[in-house]
Amino acid sequence: MKHLHRFFSSDASGGIILIIAAVLAMIMANSGATSGWYHDFLETPVQLRVGTLEINKNMLLWINDALMAVFFLLVGLEVKRELMQGSLASLRQAAFPVIAAIGGMIVPALLYLAFNYADPITREGWAIPAATDIAFALGVLALLGSRVPLALKIFLMALAIIDDLGAIIIIALFYTNDLSMASLGVAAVAIAVLAVLNLCGVRRTGVYILVGVVLWTAVLKSGVHATLAGVIVGFFIPLKEKHGRSPAKRLEHVLHPWVAYLILPLFAFANAGVSLQGVTLEGLTSILPLGIIAGLLIGKPLGISLFCWLALRLKLAHLPEGTTYQQIMAVGILCGIGFTMSIFIASLAFGSVDPELINWAKLGILVGSISSAVIGYSWLRVRLRPSV
């Protein structure tokens, strides 16, 4: 029990469990004895009905759309705290992850197009390497434990959130044909209600969560990625302390173990099971997976590092306190973990064209993401000193 308590008390424990869940998913998805059970579990239908409202989704989508909204709620709370009181409190500090995210989307997309521009079909996947899987990136960072400066973790969170928002906008503009304006209208009203609650000083967290459920449902029905609702709710929950209590900090404290030890490992287990059946070296070196690998492994860190360097040289932004440019470069490599967000964009880009292209895209995403995780982790492990 003593060793178990020590493990769960360590900062790296959540990341270790997430990696174990991902490896387990890969093994089960590629084993003849367990692949059927694994896919049956993910395809299990789950129905929610409240009055006339009905949501029918399989287990995989409930995990990705509902449980991950809770994760994004926690991320929103943490980023808000740093924007208001911490390492992103000044305009120049807050601008740094925004500039980094822009570079981290533009350069990978251009690098992908350098490989695929001549092919009008694979060219449609230009946004695949522009995405970052924030959950896996933070999970890998968590493996380094307490040696990671808080400012560096917050920088990665803020960068990945902006990256995700960019990906959501790209999906809405280029890959979605059936946005529901009525649902977007309901979402806008829910956001307005959250703003009024905040301005009126309402401090009951449950009220924000209730409106957040309405917002999540509306965003889900609109065709936009529903996890966005979690970030929005997190930004509106009051942070200011009153009588020594802060609703945002209290909720953050409550959510953290649930997210680290249940939601993220379940997310990893549900999404890491990529089948390697039929994979060949010849296929891996075709323009589609090569463009994705190059975009994630080279384009992401290059774009983030280049735009950060320009921001510092032009004095548009400051480095987060307690971090170095080399650490920022390593975080840029971690942002090459595109994984689930990249797979989602690939399914939108090629789903109606050729399922075989999705398989090759998944292979490129897997190779690029794993390579980025290993290299980014190794670089940070060398650059970060263990805390005493």
Curated annotation (Swiss-Prot):
Main localization, broad class: membrane
InterPro entries on file: Na/H_antiporter_dom_sf, NhaA
Domain of life according to the entry: Bacteria
Any one GO molecular-function label of the UniProt entry: sodium:proton antiporter activity
Keywords, comma-separated and alphabetical: Antiport, Cell inner membrane, Cell membrane, Ion transport, Membrane, Sodium, Sodium transport, Transmembrane, Transmembrane helix, Transport
Topology of this chain in the membrane: Multi-pass membrane protein
Database matches in Pfam families: Na_H_antiport_1
A single cellular component GO annotation: plasma membrane
Catalytic activity: Na(+)(in) + 2 H(+)(out) = Na(+)(out) + 2 H(+)(in)
Keyword Transmembrane helix appears in the UniProt entry: yes
Residue intervals annotated with topology Periplasmic: 32-58, 117-122, 177-180, 223, 273-286, 351-357
Subcellular location: Cell inner membrane
Transmembrane regions: 12-31, 59-80, 97-116, 123-130, 155-176, 181-200, 205-222, 224-236, 254-272, 287-310, 340-350, 358-380
Family named by the database record: Belongs to the NhaA Na(+)/H(+) (TC 2.A.33) antiporter family.
Function, in words: Na(+)/H(+) antiporter that extrudes sodium in exchange for external protons.
Record-given protein name: Na(+)/H(+) antiporter NhaA
Protein's organism: Escherichia coli O6:K15:H31 (strain 536 / UPEC)
Gene behind the chain: nhaA
